[in-house]
C-alpha cells in the first residue's frame, strides 16, 4: 500500500505500513479521522504528496470519513458549540442568488414537511437503532430546512446555492447514521456540525478552478493564518523564511505552498479605468511572428503566387499539393498521382519540370531576396 521510510527505524519504532494500518483500524472503528491525526502520525516518515493522496484515497475506499480544519470527532462539548438558533420557517433565497423553478419547487416541498418535537426525535432515533430505514428517511426529511438555513451562510464562496444544499444534505445523511440520542443533545444541534463539515469540505474541494487536495487546502489555510499573525506582530509582510520557521517547514516548502495557493486569473479580466482592455491583450504570444517577419512572409506569399501563375495549371497544382502550399500538408508522389489519375512517375516528371522553370533567372530573381 505504501513505501517504507527511507530512514532506518529506531528500536521499537513502527514501520510506515504499521502506522497506516493502525490509522485504518481506528478510522473503521470510529468512522472518521481528522487530517490533523493523519498528518501527525505520518509526519516522521517523509511521505510526499502523491503518497499522502494515495493513502487518503485508500481510507475513502475503506469507508473512513476524513474531516477538515483539524476538527476532532464531535464530542458533546464540541456539538454544544453548534447550538445556534436558525429560523427554519425562513426558506427565502439569499440576496443576489438566482434560482430556477426546480429549486423553488424543492424549497416549497421541504417547507411542507412538519418539524419534529423532541419526543418524536427520540422515537425516530430509537427506531433507527433497530434498523428502521423509514425512520432514517423521516428524520432526514424533517431537517432539510436546517440544511438550507446553514447553506445560506456559505453563499458567495465559489459554489452555487443548490450545490451547497446538496453537499449539506450529504452531511445530514451522515448525521442521521451516527446520531446517538443517549448523549443528551438535540438532533438539529448534532446535525449542524456534520452539515457544516460537509459544506466546508466541498468548498475546499470544488470551489477552486484548479482542484487542490483537501489536506493541502488545510496546509494552505494554516499558512494564511500564520502569515496574518506575523503581519500583526511584525507590522509588515513576513518573508518565506519567517513563515517557515513559524510552521516548522523549510523555506522551499513554504514557497511551494504559496505557489499552489495562487488563484488563477481570467484573461478576460478588465484592465484600465474604461474597462476597454483585457488582461489577455497584454500577454505576449510567444508563437506569433514579429511584425517585420509577418510583413516579409506576406510579401513572399504574394511573389510566390505571381511566380506560380507563370506555370501551367497542372504544374502549379502539383507543386501546391507536393509542398502543402495551401494547407501546410505535403503529399507523396503517389497521393498526388491519385488526385490527377496518373502514375507517381508522371507526377515526378511534372514536378521536376515545374521546378526547373522556377529556377530560371526570370522567375528566381523575384524570390532571391527572400532566400538570403
UniProtKB/Swiss-Prot annotation:
Provide the residue ranges listed under DNA-binding region in this record: 333-352
Which example biological process does GO assign this protein? DNA-templated transcription initiation
Q: Where is this region: Sigma-70 factor domain-4?
A: 307-360
Region entry Sigma-70 factor domain-3, spans: 218-294
Q: Where in the cell is it found?
A: Cytoplasm
Q: Which Gene3D superfamilies match?
A: RNA Polymerase Primary Sigma Factor (1.10.601.10), Sigma-70 factor, region 1.1 (1.10.220.120), Winged helix-like DNA-binding domain superfamily/Winged helix DNA-binding domain (1.10.10.10)
Please provide, alphabetically and separated by semicolons, the GO molecular function terms listed in this UniProt record: DNA binding; sigma factor activity
Output the CDD domains linked to this UniProt entry.
Sigma70_r4
Motif span (Interaction with polymerase core subunit RpoC)? Answer: 163-166
Q: Tell me, what does this protein do in biology?
A: Sigma factors are initiation factors that promote the attachment of RNA polymerase to specific initiation sites and are then released. This sigma factor is the primary sigma factor during exponential growth.
Q: What is this protein called?
A: RNA polymerase sigma factor SigA
| Organism this protein belongs to | Halalkalibacterium halodurans (strain ATCC BAA-125 / DSM 18197 / FERM 7344 / JCM 9153 / C-125) (Bacillus halodurans)
